[in-house]
Swiss-Prot record:
<dbReference type="GO" id="GO:0031418">
    <property type="term" value="F:L-ascorbic acid binding"/>
</dbReference>
<keyword id="KW-0847">Vitamin C</keyword>
<dbReference type="GO" id="GO:0016706">
    <property type="term" value="F:2-oxoglutarate-dependent dioxygenase activity"/>
</dbReference>
<dbReference type="InterPro" id="IPR044862">
    <property type="entry name" value="Pro_4_hyd_alph_FE2OG_OXY"/>
</dbReference>
<dbReference type="GO" id="GO:0005506">
    <property type="term" value="F:iron ion binding"/>
</dbReference>
<feature type="binding site">
    <location>
        <position position="100"/>
    </location>
    <ligand>
        <name>Fe cation</name>
    </ligand>
</feature>
<feature type="binding site">
    <location>
        <position position="155"/>
    </location>
    <ligand>
        <name>Fe cation</name>
    </ligand>
</feature>
<keyword id="KW-0560">Oxidoreductase</keyword>
<dbReference type="Pfam" id="PF13640">
    <property type="entry name" value="2OG-FeII_Oxy_3"/>
</dbReference>
<feature type="binding site">
    <location>
        <position position="165"/>
    </location>
    <ligand>
        <name>2-oxoglutarate</name>
    </ligand>
</feature>
<feature type="domain" description="Fe2OG dioxygenase">
    <location>
        <begin position="80"/>
        <end position="174"/>
    </location>
</feature>
<dbReference type="GO" id="GO:0006974">
    <property type="term" value="P:DNA damage response"/>
</dbReference>
<dbReference type="InterPro" id="IPR005123">
    <property type="entry name" value="Oxoglu/Fe-dep_dioxygenase_dom"/>
</dbReference>
<dbReference type="InterPro" id="IPR023550">
    <property type="entry name" value="PKHD_hydroxylase"/>
</dbReference>
<feature type="binding site">
    <location>
        <position position="98"/>
    </location>
    <ligand>
        <name>Fe cation</name>
    </ligand>
</feature>
<keyword id="KW-0479">Metal-binding</keyword>
<dbReference type="InterPro" id="IPR006620">
    <property type="entry name" value="Pro_4_hyd_alph"/>
</dbReference>
Length: 221
């Protein structure tokens, strides 16, 4: 499984987050400021100043929500969660087809994530498009929902036709770089935990958990 979609933020967290972000009109600036030389040519959105206190405060909240979530930990095997920023796309804004930088000042980008802070009914257009080798995944998230996907994929955000698209984005440096190896480990972990919940502890399960842990040591970096 290369993608993970999950309801990360509850209604109260969303309400507080949106209320405080919408008060910061003077802190929203051009998104081109953090794009690479190639991506800046196709990036047309706004982002909250990353050095502002409110950006730092809520970036910490997002980081904590991700790192403490058991499902995300099993899927992404996060070593560091970095580059978190809040972005806004108003009418006619978009982010064209691009690839994320492999290395940033804050870490390597193995996985990218987007968290929707607005309901998908609040704006038209603005779909996140992720291109795999043989297909195109186009989606709009429910408010509070996160999608995590490999940073190796080309992706884009379609033009917002009306309304406002408010999201949080960031990157994960994983202990395991390989997409395939992360998928194998995730399946093994999920299967073992499922058997534990259904049948309880056993010597056979101990061996499976041992193999998972030792594979993680072998494949991790």
């Amino acid at each position: 499984m290369n993608f993970l979609t999950y309801k990360l933020l509850n209604l109260e967290e969303l309400k507080i987050l949106k209320l405080n972000l919408n008060k910061q009109n003077e802190l929203w600036e051009s998104g081109k400021m953090t794009a690479g030389s190639q991506a800046s040519k196709v990036k047309e959105n706004l982002q909250l100043n990353r050095n502002s206190e409110i950006s730092k405060k809520y970036s910490q909240l997002i980081r904590k929500k991700i790192i403490t979530n058991p499902l995300i930990k099993s899927f992404a095997l996060p070593k560091t969660i970095h580059g978190i920023m809040f972005t806004k796309s108003l009418q006619n804004m978009h982010y064209g087809r691009h690839i994320d930088n492999p290395f940033m000042s804050s870490g390597r980008s193995d996985l990218s994530f987007t968290i929707s802070l607005t309901n998908k009914a609040d704006y038209q257009g603005g779909e996140l498009v992720i291109e795999t080798l043989n297909s195109e995944k186009k989606l709009k998230l429910d408010a509070g929902e996160i999608i995590i996907y490999p940073s190796t994929y080309l992706h884009s955000v379609k033009k917002v036709k009306n309304g406002e698209r408010l999201v949080c984005v960031g990157w994960i440096e994983s202990y395991v770089k390989s997409i395939e190896e992360r998928e194998y480990l995730f399946d093994l972990d999920a299967g073992a935990k499922g058997l534990l919940a259904k049948y309880g502890r056993s010597d056979e399960l101990d061996n499976i958990f041992k193999s998972y842990s030792n594979l993680l040591r072998l494949l991790g970096n």
